[in-house]
Amino acid sequence: MSKIRIIGLFLMLMLLLPLHAQEIIRGHVVDEATGEGIGFASVQYKGLNLVAITDPQGYFTIRLLKGKRLTVSVLGYKTRTVDVDGDSEKLFVSLRQDAKALKEVTVNKKRTRYSRKNNPAVELMKRVVANKKRTNLALRDYYQYTKYQKLTLALNDVDPEMLENPRFSKMPWLLEQVEVSQLTNKLILPLSVDETVTQKVYRRSPHDEKSIVKGMRSSGINDFFQTGEILNTMTKDIFTDINIYDDQVRILQHPFLSPIADGAISFYRYYIEDTLLVERDSCIHLHFLPNNQQDFGFRGDLYVLKDSSCQVKRCELILPNQTDVNFVENMKLVQEFTQLPTGEWVLSVDDMIVEMVLFDFFQKGVAIKTTRLSDYAFDEIPKQLFRGKAKSAIDPDAEMQDDTFWQQHRKVQLTKSEESMGDFLNGMQSMGGFKYVLTALKLLAENYIETGQKSKVDIGPVTSMLSNNFIDGLRTRFGGQTTANLSRHLFWKGYIARGWKSKNTYYSGEMTWSLNRKKYTPDEFPKRNISILSTYDVMSPSDKFLSSDKDNVFSSWKWAKVDKMMFYKRQKLTFEREEPWGLRTMFSAKTEENESAGNMQYFKFRTTELRAEIEYSPGALYVNSKMRRHKVNREAPIITLSHTYGIEGLLGGDYTYHYTEASVFKRFWFGSWGRIDLYTRAGVQWNQVPFPLLCMPASNLSYFSHKHMFNLINNMEFMNDRFVSVDFNWDMQGKIFNRIPLIRRLHWREYIGAKMLWGALSDKNNPYLQQNSDSKVLIAFPEQTRLMNPDIPYWEISLGIRSIFRFFQVEYVRRMNYNDNRIGPKNSVRLGFTLMF
């Protein structure tokens, strides 16, 4: 949901601009002599960065730009230029073979297939790959450099006719913000600009490297949102820095194979185009493209020095139009390498432009990232710069640098619109009705209602104000939380709720003291929090597995009747600490009274427990919303271990018990075959306890998908005191659908999944055994609860489609066994919202 809310930031200005549908050219490129379709031909508007590649049958689609000229070219054919007018929606282009280009090859009836054998382009690329180590700065004992980066987000391809609309004559601040992009020659309207100056330091032995942020500042529409850093953080993770000398290039939250990776020769096709000068260096120009245009790979050009070093001087990477990447209309990356006076070749220019479109009838967006690397040095670096295990650090004065600092370090000047961003924001605020639009979008993006310009108390979550359950019927809830505008260290959040059927009143209050200063919420990374909680409420036993609020209105729609519930009174003291390098520790003390409710029967009991948890997730990156924290970089593994000790007699605790749990999450990428997410969880209850303290399956009773939960296991259907669960999900990124002609146009993504639960109940926790008939601890299991066969794990499988209308997902789930006397359905459907590239 966090990604979906980010789109809301762009929608804010889109709502103010007239929407216009795009016209599309659907064309076919054929051989003039044979009439056969010509695959992998380049179709490009002259002078514009708008490119399409024909599919193997010669078909292509590209936006219709009236009055422009379309250039069609492919190796072995003469280039042809076509004028585009209003009648060009269906375009037929025939190309004539270039006799000069074919003079040195034998012409057969069928065109010659691409061959890697005896191919001079392939032989050159083998030398480029073999010489990669020469550019690897990590072989040096030390190195450091300064990186200046500017990231601009803007509305793209603004219609000039739209700006002539009389309604805009009253908005001079809007017209003045529109400018021509030097990269695409299109009209753009910058919405935000983010600048960062970073010092990168590296030491070979003992190995360490750090990024130290020396200066950072941001201005734009994200300033209107208290959690506006989500936009910048997510954008930087999506459009991350790359190095083509790495085998895998991660961008758009996907790994792409670099054109000079060790395995690139089998994935890409290479063609030598020409020999030319790049600046003053003689270079061989190579063109490359993926074997299959639908796979996640680049198309582009390499300029390799014409000497024994085979050093890449310049590279241009373009995402083929046929690549099944959502929301991206065009993407181009440019990297340039410079030779230092000492002889080393280093990256000096790293630019990226990504043109995006949410839907064809929405205004387009563009992200422009400009990066300059300079001040390379290889001298010994002081040890104090490597203190601590964190890979990144921010200087205390980074956000307070003056204009002198930026004039010194800004390697690329701001455009006129970027410099006047403050005037643009002031103009927006002065516009009639803007306050109401902003309030609505804040509600969509943040799920809380602010009580002032610098809100000290936020009201919400809004989606939890109305819900229903078996005990309460209609349930209303009013809650809120304080912000750092009231105190940088002390925070409170809570709610009061009313069940209109039960006539019960519920409450929750939590006070948090943060040992480090916060910008807005206490959950900001890294946590150094001490919290005390007091709650009285009603819940289903399966609610404890939900990652969202149990009162969320969307979670109230369930496929099973949840009539077995419990009242609980909970007091809890928690200390949580996070380290910048990925370690999280948590210690808590809790006392809780439980009483059965609805159709679940057991006597009231109390537990008192101490709990310790440790989690390690190296490289994890987080963003904060007002509700919770979201992990951005899902490539980071997560390893968690916890132990709970129940103490009889302490604060009225009725039982002594030990419960241990461990879990591991890891994502694996398989190139064009997509990714596999694997989550494994295991737990053991070591002592004899009543069934509410046993291991229950993580049951998802909602029609909406929830990660790492079983879709077709009912509430408390199985009882175990030891278990292992596995959640396997393979997202194939359209690998199959992209090869089905009609479905390919829908840009759907297929995925398959399987969930397994192995469980066992030891004799000491089985209330139905004769040996336990006199036990004062065990309680009879609820009706319809049963035991698992330790030799037969439970299985359910799923087949799903994501990216339906780019947002929605539908998943078919099937229960494979334990179908005798089952309570729920054997087959069902789950819905979800997923925003992915």
Segments the model singles out, each with a brief description of its role:
Residues 49-59:
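Short, acidic Ser/Thr/Gly-rich low-complexity loop/linker segments typical of extracellular
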Residues 25-31, 58, 93:
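A short, amphipathic beta-strand motif
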Residues 35-39, 61-68:
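Short Pro-Gly-centered beta-turn/loop motif in secreted/extracellular proteins
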Residues 23-25, 32-47:
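Short, ordered, surface-exposed loop/turn motifs in non-cytosolic proteins
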Residues 111-283, 289-297, 359-460, 464-467, ...:
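Structured extracytoplasmic
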Residues 30, 74-77, 90-137:
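Short, acidic, small-residue-rich periplasmic hinge/interaction motif at the N-terminus
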Residues 45, 69-82:
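A short, solvent-exposed loop/turn motif at the edges and junctions
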Residues 9, 254-256, 388-837:
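Exposed, low-structure sequence patches enriched in small/polar residues
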